[in-house]
């Protein structure tokens, strides 16, 4: 334990005075040993077997907000490491993150980001703007650059409802912390190429919430159809993708029953048309 916490048992002075708005910066000053630290990994280590890979995440903007959906599969090489992983994280009332890449590090990053936003709101008395959240996450990803260069790459997808603009927004990242706003829809992970093809074909500007969720599930189904690392609906085990919805009313996770109904609609339609719904030529 850090020396800052040893002694009389009372909180050190740093905890009793105004500090940085970033929880990560505060912890780095007061007790850096409590931050995730993998700096001493050997440079010639092979990380592939150490942590499963989280795979495909999609996001779709609709008229009242934004939908974030993720498949449940995690892989380790050619092995299915987990069939029911949760890759979506509510980060505050109006934002959420989906992770692809090194699962263990991605989950820790998402949870630390949750604390980061909570710390800022307590410290400042107001939440960060959505763009502020996007930039703060970019800084945290950048601090993972050393690990990314050793193969532990984490690529999150941030979505949120911008209360100042009254719309859903999507932000993607590269492994070195570059932040890019995406418009209408986006996908990340091993199946993202196939998911984006479906999103491009099915997206409409006037989508309602349920339709946006259905489009996201169709995109994940297409990804699973061509990418073995992406899991499709598992009807026998009743394992379905997870879907988060963020609107002016805040964040909510669609219930298992809601997603099950939508997933069964997708699967039933695929029995008739295995390649999925078609888009008009003109």
Swiss-Prot record:
Protein encoded by which gene: prcB
Record carries keyword Iron-sulfur: no
Pathway: Protein degradation; proteasomal Pup-dependent pathway
EC number: 3.4.25.1
Species of the source: Thermobifida fusca (strain YX)
SUPFAM superfamilies: N-terminal nucleophile aminohydrolases (Ntn hydrolases) (SSF56235)
Functional description taken from the UniProt entry: Component of the proteasome core, a large protease complex with broad specificity involved in protein degradation.
UniProt GO BP: modification-dependent protein catabolic process; proteasomal protein catabolic process
Active-site residue list: 55
Subunit structure: The 20S proteasome core is composed of 14 alpha and 14 beta subunits that assemble into four stacked heptameric rings, resulting in a barrel-shaped structure. The two inner rings, each composed of seven catalytic beta subunits, are sandwiched by two outer rings, each composed of seven alpha subunits. The catalytic chamber with the active sites is on the inside of the barrel. Has a gated structure, the ends of the cylinder being occluded by the N-termini of the alpha-subunits. Is capped by the proteasome-associated ATPase, ARC.
Molecular function GO labels: threonine-type endopeptidase activity
Broadest EC class assigned to this enzyme: hydrolase
Predominant place of localization: cytoplasm
Protein name: Proteasome subunit beta
Activity control summary: The formation of the proteasomal ATPase ARC-20S proteasome complex, likely via the docking of the C-termini of ARC into the intersubunit pockets in the alpha-rings, may trigger opening of the gate for substrate entry. Interconversion between the open-gate and close-gate conformations leads to a dynamic regulation of the 20S proteasome proteolysis activity.
